[in-house]
Design a protein with these regions (language model features):
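Short glycine-rich anion-binding loops that position phosphate/pyrophosphate groups of nucleotides
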Residues: 69-72, 139-143
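Surface-exposed, charge/polar-rich loops and edge strands
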Residues: 2-20, 24, 31-35, 129-134, ...
Length: 240
């Protein structure tokens, strides 16, 4: 009995230590990102958008989830709006309950919105759809494709809950690189990481640099392997 209590104590202490470490890492990374000069932020964002346009054209015909930019994150809206013109339906995440997977509501320019968690806008009254691919902002990026978010665990729970699993594309700036987030069993790794330095795929042993052509091929292969896009992805997008 005493041995079991000691093990539980060590696990609790480790969990508390890791939580404190991650929170400190988050504060550092947010401050670093917000301190980036506007000109650098714009240049990095343009490079990320160019990589997305070059490597992820295979997302056409899918339902693509993205996030409203927050605290200096890359703004995916121009890329997503361009995809919408080529048959993609776009969705934004909404928190429906603490500790639950996210709900995804269809978005287009001009859709009615209200503020949700973190005061981020979410669509009101639009269709709830299941994404085939997710463009997920990363506060920190580890060397294995592990992603540090804001601590709510919403994307981890969502990626576990959705079958087939959507393509997970982590978006970050190079200043968000960390050695590791010390992944736990509940942490879900990204399929791809895109920064201003280019595109990487998460593979056994780490991250592998991809050309735009190689990325398109890998996206298509993963989509076919997982049975994406889903049937509901085939509807026409609403007029903007």
């Amino acid at each position: 009995m005493a041995a079991c209590q000691e093990v539980r104590h060590r696990m609790t202490s480790l969990s508390a230590d890791l939580k404190n470490r991650r929170n400190a890492e988050r504060a550092t990374l947010i401050a670093r990102r917000l301190a980036a000069p506007a000109a650098d932020h714009a240049r990095w964002s343009a490079l990320i958008e160019a990589s997305l346009r070059g490597g992820f054209s295979a997302l056409e015909g899918m339902i693509v989830g993205f996030c409203w930019p927050f605290q200096g994150e890359f703004d995916a809206r121009p890329f997503v709006t361009d995809l919408q013109g080529r048959g993609v339906r776009a969705v934004l995440p909404a928190v429906v309950a603490k500790g639950q997977p996210l709900e995804f509501r269809e978005w287009w320019p001009g859709v009615a919105m209200s503020n949700g968690v973190y005061d981020l806008p979410v669509p009101v009254g639009s269709s709830v759809l299941t994404p085939d691919a997710l463009l997920i902002p990363a506060l920190g990026v580890g060397s294995q494709g592990d992603r540090l978010g804001y601590g709510g665990g919403y994307f981890d729970r969502t990626l576990v809950a959705l079958h087939p699993k959507p393509l997970a594309v982590g978006l970050a700036f190079e200043l968000s690189r960390i050695a590791t987030i010390v992944p736990q069993p509940h942490d879900v790794f990204m399929d791809f990481i895109v920064t201003e330095a280019g595109i990487e795929a998460a593979v056994a042993g780490g991250l592998m640099k991809l050309s735009a052509e190689d990325c398109r091929a890998r996206v298509a292969a993963l989509a076919a392997e997982r049975g994406l896009p889903r049937r509901e992805s085939s509807g026409a997008a609403p007029a903007n």
